[in-house]
């Protein structure tokens, strides 16, 4: 299986790695930079922890970098 391991960076998974994943979560700078993203290969879908979103799939290049609209942008000026 070929999985993305970074932005526009696909790599062939090692033997046994037949699941691609994209994991996103907020850290202390989420409001400035957006969610953190980790991508890669695994033998099974990683365990979901509180506050972490994980998407798993098992076909080539099925885990592209998430398209985000920055919710951290604040409107300028007064309404």
UniProtKB/Swiss-Prot annotation:
GO CC terms: extracellular region
Superkingdom of the organism of origin: Eukaryota
Compartments, as annotated in UniProt: Secreted
Pfam families: Toxin_cobra-type
Tissue spec: Expressed by the venom gland.
UniProt cross-references to InterPro entries, sorted A to Z: Snake_3FTx, Snake_toxin-like_sf, Snake_toxin_con_site, Toxin_cobra-type
Disulfide bond residue pairs: 3-20, 13-41, 26-30, 45-56, 57-62
Remaining remarks: Exists in two forms which are separated by reverse-phase high-performance liquid chromatography, but which have the same sequence and molecular weight. The existence of cis and trans isomers may explain the two different elution peaks.
Record's function text: Binds with high affinity to muscular (alpha-1/CHRNA1) and neuronal (alpha-7/CHRNA7) nicotinic acetylcholine receptor (nAChR) and inhibits acetylcholine from binding to the receptor, thereby impairing neuromuscular and neuronal transmission. Produces paralysis, clear dyspnea and lethality on mice.
Family: Belongs to the three-finger toxin family. Long-chain subfamily. Type II alpha-neurotoxin sub-subfamily.
Protein's name in the database: Alpha-elapitoxin-Aa2e
């Amino acid at each position: 299986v070929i999985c993305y391991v970074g932005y526009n960076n696909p790599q062939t998974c090692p033997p046994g790695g037949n699941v691609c994943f994209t994991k996103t979560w907020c850290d202390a700078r989420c409001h400035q930079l957006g969610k953190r993203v980790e991508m890669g290969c695994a033998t099974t879908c990683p365990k979901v922890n509180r506050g972490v979103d994980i998407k798993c799939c098992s076909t080539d290049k099925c885990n592209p970098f998430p398209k985000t609209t920055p919710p951290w942008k604040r409107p300028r000026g007064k309404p």
